[in-house]
């Protein structure tokens, strides 16, 4: 398949005026969106939630690559200047393929093992992730690069239940706390003092994690680092939008717009006490296919 060129987008606006595309399997990428809006408040964003196919974590490698490519192609078709793949599972399997196919910056997520290794005092770091992220190579690569030379033990915890709970609006619920207690108790017993949130849905579980484990773990995620990296990539490419303005966010979803709207009103990165997403009361949400 030939590369998809940025010039194929139908929007005639200058490249710097185009929005940043953000993609996730569902609502998890909203935690990354919140960081992008803090780091790049002047930028417009087009967010695509592939909620018809969430969760990605238990899907086959081929399915993950195909769904991710279709979603990114839809963002490119609508006209974006860069794409942030705000999904750890999609990043684990698709970044190389996406960068070969699409001629615009593709920014992915890397599990935040490096800062967790730097911060640990116990020498034990936990990683909470989906089966897909644990199956991919990105996590193994960063463990090999940062944890092993430092002599830090990395313990992995996996769940297929947490993403559906967040998507159902139950991030701060008894059901979520039961699952978290089961999967994280072995990490706490082993002395982990840092917990890498290896899925963009998981910052929304911070309140439930703290309710069960108090300050046992410092919670570490990639959102702020990805936002800084996006700003640097746009700056190097002359793609930063100038002017004193506040960017707008538009949303695409592959299933129920009303459900995504409800999640936008309730989800808070960092848990129940976190700041709400800085979105308008009635966000523009369009149903799409990929």
Swiss-Prot record:
GO annotation (BP), single: peptidoglycan biosynthetic process
Protein's gene: murI
Catalytic activity, reaction form: L-glutamate = D-glutamate
HAMAP family: Glu_racemase
UniProt-listed Gene3D superfamilies: 3.40.50.1860
Enzyme class: isomerase
Matching InterPro entries: Asp/Glu/hydantoin_racemase, Asp/Glu_race, Asp/Glu_racemase_AS_1, Asp/Glu_racemase_AS_2, Glu_race
Membrane-spanning residues: none
Residues annotated as catalytic: 87, 199
Keywords: Cell shape, Cell wall biogenesis/degradation, Isomerase, Peptidoglycan synthesis
Database matches in SUPFAM superfamilies: Aspartate/glutamate racemase
Disordered as annotated region, ranges: 271-290
EC numbers: 5.1.1.3
Protein name from the UniProt record: Glutamate racemase
Pathway: Cell wall biogenesis; peptidoglycan biosynthesis
Annotated positions binding substrate: 24-25, 56-57, 88-89, 200-201
Annotated organism of origin: Deinococcus radiodurans (strain ATCC 13939 / DSM 20539 / JCM 16871 / CCUG 27074 / LMG 4051 / NBRC 15346 / NCIMB 9279 / VKM B-1422 / R1)
Superkingdom of origin: Bacteria
Entry's family note: Belongs to the aspartate/glutamate racemases family.
Pfam families: Asp_Glu_race
Gene Ontology MF term list: glutamate racemase activity
Function of the molecule: Provides the (R)-glutamate required for cell wall biosynthesis.
